[in-house]
Amino acid sequence: MKRVEDYVRSIPDFPEEGIIFRDVTSVLQDADGLQLAIDEMAKLLEGVDCDVIAGAESRGFIFGMPLAYLLKKPFVLVRKAGKLPCETISKSYELEYGTATIEIHKDAIKPGQKVVLVDDLIATGGTMKAAAELVEELGGEVVKMLFLIELAGLEGRKVLEGYDVGSVVVYEGK
């Protein structure tokens, strides 16, 4: 039986020498791989009490939406700044070469709601940390952070210390 990592394309020396790029598009392009990825992520949510699934732009949408559908939960978009039409709150965070800003609608999370945050990959943890801070600012509680792939060598879990973090596939390097 194939595992999710069997569907992940690994590209050496991209975007720079010494890096192995883990390409999730190869998972999405295979019906069996996509189904397996969603099923494995859903298994990591067994026993998790949540009210809302939220996904980080853009691949968090790809994996978060089917999970919300399976669990019969609403789905909330965490978007790059300037993409949401209604009143938002925003959070800036550090990137390797600069900063980025994400935002969420002010009415997307109600006080006391239990939220699962979803993204395709955890690297440094900056995006998901900022997303968690937005949820908490609105009065929500982050009960799980869920990723298809984790690049353990980039130590994103340290940034997310105190949160329940789950990953389907863990690669030890960067």
Positions of predicted regions on the chain:
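Short, glycine/charge-rich flexible loops or terminal/linker lids adjacent to PRPP-binding catalytic cores
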Residues: 74-116
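Conserved acidic residues
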Residues: 51, 113, 143
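Short Gly/Thr/Asp-enriched flexible loops that form oxyanion-binding sites at enzyme active sites
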Residues: 62-71
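PRPP-dependent phosphoribosyltransferase catalytic core
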Residues: 6-7, 130-174
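Conserved G/P- and acidic residue-centered "switch" motifs that form tight phosphate/ATP-binding loops
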Residues: 120, 125
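Short glycine-rich phosphate-binding loop at a beta-alpha junction
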Residues: 49-57
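Active-site-facing substrate-recognition patch
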Residues: 1-50, 100
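Residue-level signature of catalytic and energy-coupling elements of molecular machines
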Residues: 18, 53, 75, 145
